[in-house]
Amino acid sequence: MKKLIVSFALMVITLASYAQVYKMYSTRNYHNQLRLNTMTGEVQQIQDDGQSWIICSAREISGDKESRFCLYETQNMWTFIMLDTYTGKNWQVQFSVKGEDYMFAAPINIFSLAYPEATSNWTNRFQMFATQNMWTFILLDSYNGRLWQVQYSTQDLDNLFCIPINKDELGSDNEKCIFSIQPLTSMYQYYLINDRTCLLYTSPSPRD
């Protein structure tokens, strides 16, 4: 009986660990889901008949931080944006039912916007927010208030970019999220909020 209890406990621990490393994302095609390795950034398309394909190979092969990578759904049903929440790097990830030639991961921003150390244990440092322009997201460094406009495209992969909106740090030496974004009534503006001081900053929207 004791052996059975120990075996069951080990199984529960293993499943919990798996759930923390791997995250499943539903898609608007009910036959397919995406499985993300949140440590490495590997993305697999999982079909309900048991078939699977690697859409995006590991971006951080030696990654050991759970929840470092995440996926953001776009208004295009076949496209997600993958974000490295430690560095701000991001990729356009596309799944498909037409075959592997239509599955890919294309880099949008390949440059590190922050430089974690081996001991860094950041949580949701970089975050993305959808805008009313379906092709555009706002990328926020929630530790210091820096902002970028991120654009994806399903027609022209040369039209992917990540450009700064606000390069200036509005806070420093923070090891947790203190900035957040809230939309204004105007579709062209938003509030950047310092949750520690309650200061509000307004900014124009991303370009059309």
Which residues make up each language-model segment?
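Trp- and S/T/G-rich repeat-edge/linker motifs of beta-rich repeat architectures
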Residues: 49-64, 99-120, 157-174
